[in-house]
Amino acid sequence: FNVLGSPKQHVVDNTIKELNTHAEVFDMMGLPTTPYAKINIHVGGTYGGDFAGTAKRWCANFHRLSETAQARITVENDDKASMWSTRYLYDYIHKDTLVPIVHDVHHHKFCTGGLTDKEAMSLASSTWFDIKPVIHYSQDRSVEHNDPKIRAQAHSDSYWTPVDTHGLDVDVMLECKHKEIGLFKMRQLLA
């Protein structure tokens, strides 16, 4: 939906308008102009595996955003092997823009970029500077329901394994279908 690296100008123009509008709403709400009040997006496609070209467009268009939008943007790793791993986000996006990376533990299982989860989470955490890093955590819905017809990337209803932050001081956003029930389950698992 919001694709700063798109080769289509109308998609980029709509994305810039959308992200700037989100930042304006955050401003009206009095939220901090930092990644603490993040606008989290995926980089989007690679357009034939052209990571360098896509990243060049993404970074150039990122700099067209309002200052308050730029200050809040974070990027998240993808759940497909041919897409944006935490490593690629670091190498192609963060190094140019200093945009923080939200490491999604579940997505990492499908797009590792050659890193372990611990290495990827540590790398992503290093991009947050003085703001507490954020990670996303969900589990495999097909395992939860013992149904191989469900896509492995689909988020679970709840949790059966506690989140492993690898000793890092991070905020964990729980991404499960049963929302608060999942939170209570996670609290039990971590107790």
Segments the model singles out, each with a brief description of its role:
Residues F1-L4, I41-G45, H106, S138-D140, ...:
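Short loop/turn segments at strand-loop or loop-helix junctions that form parts
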Residues N2-P100:
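Active-site acidic/histidine proton-transfer and metal-coordination neighborhood
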Residues I73, D104, V172:
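Conserved, mostly hydrophobic/aromatic
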Residues M83, H103, C111-T112:
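Active-site-adjacent pocket scaffolds in enzyme catalytic domains
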Residues V99, K109-A191:
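Histidine-acidic metal/acid-base catalytic patches
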